[in-house]
Amino acid sequence: METNNIKEEQILIRITGNDRPGLTASIMEILASKNANILDIGQADIHSTLSLGILIRISEEASGQVMKELLFKATELGVQIGFSPVTDDEYENWVNQQGKNRYILTLIGRTLTAKQIEAATKIICKQGLNIDSILRLTGRMSIKHPERNMRACIEFSLRGTPTDRAAMQEELMHISADMEIDFS
């Protein structure tokens, strides 16, 4: 796509590794120096391990230099970096998905196991919903002092329209009773 005869492109940047203060600021400094527009950004930090995704729109003229500078900065910071081009059509298709219904499903239990999350996510998938994000809502769980762990809670941000909402609720109620977890 062109703006004022300047050819632009979208690039998805993926950064993973040990998190530290100032990492995002140093990445943004490079992107700002080349006038990149941020189309989307998301970050998760699990046990000091960073997963950062940034979708940028930048002039084709500046894209090579920005990727080179980001690669050097990633090496300096000790993180891994990857780049993927996103075509105009792919980007617009993604934009057009934003009008889909959104739901929040919360999973609560004394502890949460992979088996419980598997059961919930299979129902989500069966209903044709996509998980946009998963977020832990409760504090960190102690393994040395489990008596301090009152409950565990995660939130699924879902997008789409369930194929059968009543059946979905019934299935969630069934696993709630069988697996000692609650949904809201």
Where are these regions (language model features)?
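A conserved regulatory-domain signal marking ACT and ACT-like small-molecule sensing domains
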Residues: 2-184
